[in-house]
């Protein structure tokens, strides 16, 4: 940014500082013949700086004896994605200088842009639709490459590219010719300069920007849930106030779990049917059973709990309380069945789900199925923010002297023998906990069943790649 600030001012104001601007401005060259080359020059300086960093990184690799340089990844994963922000900065820098009466005011405009980027998140403007040139980060891996994550980033880039074109048109309209540097007279002449090709370009860019903006909003805010940082913190604070009081409430343990997981990697979708055998391992009767959705990405579509009625359910919280018709005595067992779905539709503004991907899915049971009972993990941790929301300064672990805490671990108190049937695309390998007892490929699907031959803690994962 510093390079763009300096060189844009030098390019735009050099003629005036050397007193040759009246000669150049008297030529029949159109304004765009000044704007475009200067923008391209600043862009090339920034891109050259980036390429120098690539050469430096390669030299470090070679100096350490590493010869598998993978130049294609330098190009596709570093150079190409960063060319766009370089051009965006160059356009903004040249526009700021075209707008300003002198280069120092232009520098001030760019500084204001930098300050805005820093404080935008603090005033609720975190969405990439509001921050110039910003696009979501693209998660990269050797196994999945960029997957489908690149699509959202390029939609944002198209949106901001259209806006950058509007800035270039504005720079063309406001470009100084002759001795006049005041903004007001240039604004008065702008409508006349907008006629013809500049107006057509501005109209097309406006249509593209509005169209892509609507599409981006539909994906990030309709197909997917979008929350600002403050909204997310407020949600966690309210969630804690409602449900943390149930943390030490006696709950049944999962004694046996059976899952049928159908993965559709190309769609980044998982359909799960499950069954829990719940057992009361406490020494007290249990009247209420708390069922909690532990992952925002996974939706609990259906649940059946014979012998119980739904006493409380807040859908946005994903928290259900069931009142048993007959309390569970110590040692009693009950059956609970459910259906869940995890489906990554469209693209997001940030925080992409990298657990369920085209190649390299890795999901644990808490990301596929509901949990029993309340757990403090995932709540607001920052002490300052907790005080602002009227919460205790921090969530402390149980004291060493608290022997009741030994009755439950991070993943619950009981042990279970998972029975997992996992299906995926025919060209991928499914992996689950336990011993593989069957593996069949038919109709383009590969289905494997895994059964644990010994009890394990109810915390396991499945993979497909």
Question: Language-model segments: which ranges?
Answer:
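A surface-exposed beta-strand-loop module
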Residues: 295-359, 406-410
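Terminal transmembrane helical anchor/hairpin motif
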Residues: 66, 103-188, 223-225
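Extended, low-hydrophobicity, Ser/Thr/Pro/Gly-biased non-transmembrane segments
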Residues: 232-238, 248, 339-464
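Secretory targeting signals
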Residues: 1, 36-101, 139-142, 149-152
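Transmembrane helix boundary and interhelical loop/hinge segments in multi-pass membrane proteins
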Residues: 5-30, 180
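Long, hydrophobic alpha-helical segments
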Residues: 1-14, 49, 53, 338
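N-terminal, polar/Ser/Thr-rich
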Residues: 198-268, 380-392, 408-412
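Asparagine-centered strand-capping/turn motif at beta-strand->loop junctions
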Residues: 263, 277-282
């Amino acid at each position: 940014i510093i390079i763009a600030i300096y060189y844009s001012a030098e390019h735009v104001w050099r003629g005036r500082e050397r007193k040759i601007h009246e000669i150049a401005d008297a030529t029949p060259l159109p304004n765009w013949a000044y704007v475009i080359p200067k923008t391209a020059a600043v862009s090339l300086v920034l891109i050259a700086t980036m390429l120098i960093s690539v050469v430096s990184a390669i030299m470090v690799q070679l100096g350490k004896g590493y010869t598998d340089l993978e130049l294609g990844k330098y190009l596709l994963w570093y150079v190409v994605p960063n060319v766009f922000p370089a051009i965006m900065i160059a356009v903004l820098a040249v526009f700021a200088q075209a707008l300003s009466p002198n280069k120092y005011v232009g520098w001030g405009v760019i500084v204001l842009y930098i300050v805005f980027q820093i404080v935008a998140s603090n005033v609720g403007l975190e969405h990439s639709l509001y921050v110039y040139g910003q696009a979501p980060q693209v998660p990269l891996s050797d196994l999945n490459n960029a997957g489908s994550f690149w699509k959202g980033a390029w939609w944002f880039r198209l949106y901001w590219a259209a806006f950058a074109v509007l800035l270039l048109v504005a720079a063309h309209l406001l470009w100084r010719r002759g001795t006049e540097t005041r903004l007001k007279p240039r604004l008065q002449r702008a409508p006349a300069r907008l006629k013809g090709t500049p107006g057509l370009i501005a109209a097309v860019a406006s249509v593209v920007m509005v169209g892509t903006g609507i599409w981006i909003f539909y994906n990030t805010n309709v197909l997917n849930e979008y929350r600002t940082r403050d909204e997310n913190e407020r949600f966690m604070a309210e969630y804690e106030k409602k449900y943390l009081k149930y943390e030490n409430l006696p709950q049944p343990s999962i004694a046996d779990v059976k899952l049928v997981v159908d993965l559709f990697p190309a769609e980044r979708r998982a359909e799960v049917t499950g069954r829990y055998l719940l057992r009361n391992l406490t020494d007290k009767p249990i009247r209420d059973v708390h069922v909690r959705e532990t992952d925002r990405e996974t939706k609990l579509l259906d649940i059946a709990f014979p012998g119980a009625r739904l006493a409380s359910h807040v859908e946005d919280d994903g928290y259900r309380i069931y009142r048993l018709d007959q309390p569970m005595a110590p040692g009693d067992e009950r059956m609970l069945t459910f259906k869940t779905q995890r489906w990554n539709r469209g693209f997001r503004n940030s925080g992409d789900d990298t657990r369920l991907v085209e190649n390299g899915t890795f999901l644990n049971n808490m990301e596929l199925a509901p949990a029993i009972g309340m757990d403090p993990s995932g709540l607001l941790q920052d002490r300052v923010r907790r005080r602002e929301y009227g919460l205790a300064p921090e969530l402390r672990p149980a004291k060493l002297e608290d022997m009741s805490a030994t009755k439950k671990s991070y993943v619950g108190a009981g042990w279970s023998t998972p029975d997992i049937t996992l299906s995926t695309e025919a060209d991928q390998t499914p992996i689950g906990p336990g011993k593989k007892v069957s593996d069949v490929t038919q109709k383009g699907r590969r289905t494997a069943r895994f059964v644990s031959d010994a009890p394990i803690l109810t915390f396991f994962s499945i993979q497909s790649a």
